[in-house]
Amino acid sequence: MSRKTLYELQAENVRKTYLFIVTFSLILFAIGYFFVWYFNWGLTGIVLLAIFIVLYNWIAYEQSDKIALASVGAIPANPEEYYVLHNIVEEVALAAGIPKPNVYIMEESQPNAFATGKDPKHASVCVTTGLLQMMNREELQGVIAHEISHIRNRDILLMTVVAVVAGLIILLRDVMLRSMWWGMGESRRRDKNDNGAIILLIIGLIFSIIAPLIVLIIRSAISRQREYLADATGAFIVRDPYGLASALEKIGSYTRPMRVTSDATAHLFISNPFGRAEKLFATHPPIEERIKRLKSLTM
């Protein structure tokens, strides 16, 4: 298999993002159309559904980075208070040939980090306070280089859009569950032969079961090879694979789960924020394997 150039990888990520948005739109329309038909909302319901899908796709494309940052409680890193962090981000961005991304801080003891945005000109890097406390300069530089590699490779667009879409799926799951319990209560007060309520209950139950699986499949669609590529690319940007390898060793030794995160955003982070090992549907390769590959690199 021939190696792909950076430009080919970037173009592939953009194509996958558009394909993902189109596929998700069709699935969402199919789900919405059922409710339009069931409640007999007619043409008005179809028009409103179409408007919602277009609006949501625009938000997912244009505002997904802001949503991702807000969902984890990230705040802008004060340049004076976090001078060293800003300095490292600027150095690595310059070496990678991209504009300096916005820098955010997340009040969290778990050492972790992620990048978000739609392109190198509209990107952000977020690190936890735990990461800053545990890492020395070389290790922090390695982590930042990994995240900036995601920005340069344009992984961030697909990763962030997937996070927003997965969030909607989880929200729909929760709405279905509430509707199901509400429907059960209502059905006891109505005629036992109310077939409509029974149908809604069945659909709600099915969706509540498959929704988590849908999220896992979506997350796994983001290839684990992207993490290997970002590790290697980051190491070459700073000419040092050992900084990131050492950082991953420290990150891997911390098993306490992150306080503020969800299945929708887990794939954004450099390491699994739930503090547990995953094999099936995992979006991150094993940290041990990542460290092994980094230490085998020659600069």
From Swiss-Prot:
Entry binding sites for Zn(2+):
H146, H150, E227
Tell me the superkingdom of the source: Bacteria
Gene Ontology MF terms: metalloendopeptidase activity; zinc ion binding
List the EC numbers from the record: 3.4.24.-
- List, alphabetically, the NCBIfam families matched: PRK04897.1 (NF003425)
Give the family per the record.
Belongs to the peptidase M48B family.
The positions flagged as active site in the entry are E147
Main site of residence?
membrane
Query: Where does it live in the cell?
Result: Cell membrane
The keyword Transferase belongs to this UniProt entry's keyword annotation: no
Instruction: Show the Pfam families listed in the entry.
Output: Peptidase_M48
Membrane topology of the entry:
Multi-pass membrane protein
Q: How is the cofactor bound?
A: Binds 1 zinc ion per subunit.
The UniProt entry's GO CC annotations, sorted and at most eight, read:
plasma membrane
Identification of the protein by name: Protease HtpX homolog
Cofactor(s) needed for function: Zn(2+)
GO BP terms in the entry: proteolysis
Species this chain originates from:
Thermoanaerobacter pseudethanolicus (strain ATCC 33223 / 39E) (Clostridium thermohydrosulfuricum)
Question: Is-annotated flag, keyword Hydrolase?
Answer: yes
> Which UniProt keywords are present, listed alphabetically?
Cell membrane, Hydrolase, Membrane, Metal-binding, Metalloprotease, Protease, Transmembrane, Transmembrane helix, Zinc
Q: Could you list the residue ranges that cross the membrane?
A: 19-39, 41-61, 156-176, 198-218
